[in-house]
Amino acid sequence: MFSIIQKIEKEQIKKNIPIFRSGDTIEVKVWVIEGSKKRLQSFEGIVIAIKNRCLNSSFTVRKISNGEGVERVFQTHSHGIEEILVKRRGLVRKAKLYYLRTRTGKAARIKERLN
């Protein structure tokens, strides 16, 4: 039974996912269906959390839109994600950056990792 589940998961896992960590600024291009139309929508922000659970892996991206914080959780191996682009590497010392929810302006900035 376990080998069957493992085999199915192996087929579903995407291979073209770039390596990114918490604190990185990424752009996620997602397919959006509106009525009968299908288009690509871009969501760019800072990765504040990553949950690695094989096929059930997910990551949370936060951005500020019109002065309001917007967070979106993406399933890493979802078919709705077209591509993930890493724009900037962030230098952080924590895995979960939930403290950014309470910060605004310059206090919410993250230093850039140079390597």
Curated annotation (Swiss-Prot):
Source domain of life is Bacteria
Annotated keywords: Ribonucleoprotein, Ribosomal protein
Q: Does the keyword ATP-binding apply?
A: no
Alphabetical list of Gene3D superfamilies matching this protein: 2.30.30.790
Could you name the Gene Ontology cellular component terms for this entry?
Answer: cytosolic large ribosomal subunit
GO MF terms listed in the record are: structural constituent of ribosome
Which GO biological process categories is it annotated with?
Answer: translation
The keyword Isomerase is annotated on this UniProt entry: no
Q: Could you tell me which InterPro entries the record lists for this protein?
A: Ribosomal_bL19 (IPR001857), Ribosomal_bL19_CS (IPR018257), Ribosomal_bL19_sf (IPR038657), Translation_prot_SH3-like_sf (IPR008991)
Q: What does this protein do?
A: This protein is located at the 30S-50S ribosomal subunit interface and may play a role in the structure and function of the aminoacyl-tRNA binding site.
| Family under the similarity heading | Belongs to the bacterial ribosomal protein bL19 family.
Protein name listed in UniProt: Large ribosomal subunit protein bL19
Organism whose genome encodes this protein? Buchnera aphidicola subsp. Acyrthosiphon pisum (strain 5A)
Q: State the organism's lineage.
A: Bacteria, Pseudomonadati, Pseudomonadota, Gammaproteobacteria, Enterobacterales
Which gene name does the record give?
rplS
